[in-house]
Amino acid sequence: MKKLSVFVKDRRKEVRMTQKEFAERAGVALTVVRKIEQGKTNLNLDKVNLVLAMFGHEMAPAASIELESTDEAS
């Protein structure tokens, strides 16, 4: 599975856009595109989806799963 940062950067380069041009077209700040391409993890999902919409994709949060403790001493 491709990392989000690699996917966005590769697709942006395929359409021959600078980060600034791409950000303007996607309707997000330049810093959003930079953070995504740098692999930052503290991103706003709505902003990420504005970027992914440029390629016909969307991201959704994954369900959180709690693991049971196997520690018998507790």
What spans do the regions from the language model cover?
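Short alpha-helical DNA-recognition segment
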Residues: 16-34
